[in-house]
Amino acid sequence: MYNGILPVYKERGLTSHDVVFKLRKILKTKKIGHTGTLDPEVAGVLPVCIGNATRVSDYVMDMGKAYEATVSIGRSTTTEDQTGDTLEKKGVHSADFNKDDIDRLLESFKGIIEQIPPMYSSVKVNGKKLYEYARNNETVERPKRKVNIKDIGRISELDFKENECHFKIRVICGKGTYIRTLATDIGVKLGFPAHMSKLTRIESGGFVLKDSLTLEQIKELHEQDSLQNKLFPLEYGLKGLPSIKIKDSHIKKRILNGQKFNKNEFDNKIKDQIVFIDDDSEKVLAIYMVHPTKESEIKPKKVFN
């Protein structure tokens, strides 16, 4: 039985669910879950939690993500990416803007911004996914959402051809960010229709492309009994949370028994959630949170016996 986090390289054409389904067959275990959907046409890093690591999948999902995308100015689509039908065209020429204009524009997207999720997305409105409305040619008001663009920059020259302009960007962002919506919004600010023509997720949950294995590589390593060496411990998925190392065996026992604590037992360091780590084994003991009605206390959220 495997336990740990496995960064998978999801190839284009597969859904995130396809990856989990195939892994369950390869590894012969059902206890597998991915940490955030990647659209079928998007390639890149998809961390997968296996065995007891499924208990930290939410925390891996909450960690930052990084993408490399190609923005295409001059044509918009129904899906905001290359898979959709053309909505609008407007010829773009090198006299319309230059790379300095693009760089200044990209700076304006840094920080907390508002996005309207695309119609072809799994965001739910009134209990129904937006893509279900879109497939039925129904329109519905889409709620604006705040997302965090931690960094964004151009990583290629501008390529003007066939009345369009194409360039690559790198984006570091929080969860829930739609890069294709970002591409269309870049076009709006330039005064042109636009879409995202290619996307690769280069980092997710602290895992990068070079860490990631294809399904074929995973199958081969499993057959050689050497896959466990490629898994990251579940503790890796909690590195975004503050932690305290516990030496006292009596306190360790209380933690593993799920007892409540007064915050002042830990110098009031705990603001929201805290990970308790065994000082001897470096293994996580539990995740605690501030008590919802007694702010001076902390209570267990997850205990790892």
From Swiss-Prot:
Q: Name one GO molecular function term.
A: RNA binding
> InterPro entries annotated for this entry?
PsdUridine_synth_cat_dom_sf, PsdUridine_synth_N, tRNA_psdUridine_synth_TruB, TruB_C
What is any one GO biological process for this UniProt entry? tRNA pseudouridine synthesis
Asked if the Swiss-Prot or TrEMBL record annotates the protein with the keyword tRNA processing, the reply is yes
Which Pfam families does the entry link to? TruB_C_2, TruB_N
Q: Which reaction does it catalyse?
A: uridine(55) in tRNA = pseudouridine(55) in tRNA
The protein's superkingdom reads Bacteria
Q: Kindly identify the residues recorded as the active site.
A: D39 (nucleophile)
Keywords noted in UniProt = Isomerase, tRNA processing
The record's EC number reads: 5.4.99.25
Q: Which residues form a coiled coil?
A: none
Q: Does the UniProt entry include the keyword Cell membrane?
A: no
- In UniProt terms, what function does this protein have? Responsible for synthesis of pseudouridine from uracil-55 in the psi GC loop of transfer RNAs.
Q: To which protein family does this belong?
A: Belongs to the pseudouridine synthase TruB family. Type 1 subfamily.
Q: Could you identify this protein by its name? A: tRNA pseudouridine synthase B
Origin species, per record, is Staphylococcus aureus (strain MSSA476)
